[in-house]
Amino acid sequence: MSNGIGEKIKYFRIKHNLTQEELAKGIVSVSYLSKIERNAADPNPEAVKKLCERLGISPEKVLDKDIANDVMRWMESLLKRDLVLAHDLYQGIQTNIEKVIDADLFCLVKLHTLYYFVLTKQTDKAKQKLKLLKQDQKHFSKKETYYWLKFKAHFEYAESSYEKAFLHFQEAERLYSDVFKGDSEEYYDLIYHVAKTATVLHYSYHASVYAERALIYYRDHYRLERAAKCHILKGVNYKRIREMDEALKQFELAEALGKRLSSDTILFRVYEAIGELFHDLKMPTQAIRYYSKAYELVKHQFSVQELNAILGHVKTYIQCDKQEFSKDWLEKADTLLKTEKNMPLRYVYQVKVLRFVLYGFTTQFEKLLVKEVIPYFKSRKLYIAYATYVRLLGDYYYNNRKYKLAAEYYAEAHQAMVDIQHTDNK
């Protein structure tokens, strides 16, 4: 009798759209079926046989030595983000799910399915899978808990809940040595994503340390695309601590790898990052040159990347007081948002606020920031963006002679910066 018979019965009961009452009728009590499905009772063989007959499945293990290999290949394809292979293997695994259950791989498959849905941007399915997995988490083994933390973090990152993602990636890291022997690609994939998430949150110390650790591994193992991404992360964090020469060096190393790989994805990130560097240095001519190179790689894709390149132009033309150029590029941003309805809110808010910057501040600006923008960034602990918008609202109040309110918002912006340093130093 399969040790995972409860999981098998539950899976196929749900697949056949049967309630526990419908499946149990005339065979066992509902409470006993519930215990069988949770593997909380030693199942009666005769009862299990009848339940399986009703579901059209075998009460015995259907052993297939190939299914374990297929599952391992699928997990590896997800780790390497080979989505074409992952899709093909996923179809085969779903067709042979009974064999997966009998091989005691069902829980690992369920966990990796969450990650598969995240990578393939099947958001609704990912949310549904996350909800179901939460119900099972207290029964996870250490290995299953590791993947649960890691893949939940990926889901949270995709949902812009970066602080939650960061904490769960770190929890997974602490559990890693209890599950795996030695440092593997799995480990450095986790380390890379800690660095990436820390960079979004402006945790410069964590981002730099983790990016360097990941870079050494990917460079030594000739994983050039990941190595390039690590150089970009290091460059971004050097820029934030005003080490501009070192930042540019990292970006140039990434650019060389991007050209070697003929990777527009890498080159876009490099050109965008160099554009930001020159923008920060108040060198608008150079900034526009790189933002334009970035834009040429992604125009007409209606993507976050295209919007970022557009916003780089808007902000840089504002910086050098070329308002008409800024307005032209802002119209491109508006057109993109009308076409692509699912753009993350952090970018939508940038466009809305820049419109006020270019066309004048009104009471609608105050309402937008107080009711929507500031709460959004505060709730996600995106403190740099939060501080920027809080300070902008402070300027609005100051210019309208509401000095007490302005002082309160300036103080809040300062506290947000302190909070970043405090969290990064933990």
PLM segments and residue spans:
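A short, Lys/Arg-rich alpha-helix, primarily the initiator
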Residues: 1-15
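Short alpha-helical DNA-recognition segment
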Residues: 16-35
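DNA major-groove recognition helix of helix-turn-helix/homeodomain DNA-binding modules
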Residues: 44-61
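Structural register within alpha-helical repeat arrays
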Residues: 73, 113, 152, 194, ...
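Structural motif corresponding to the intra-repeat A-B loop/turn of tetratricopeptide repeats
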Residues: 80, 120, 159, 201, ...
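Amphipathic alpha-helical segments of tetratricopeptide repeats
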Residues: 91-98, 130-138, 170-181, 212-223, ...
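Alpha-solenoid helical repeat architecture
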Residues: 101-107, 140-147, 181-189, 222-229, ...
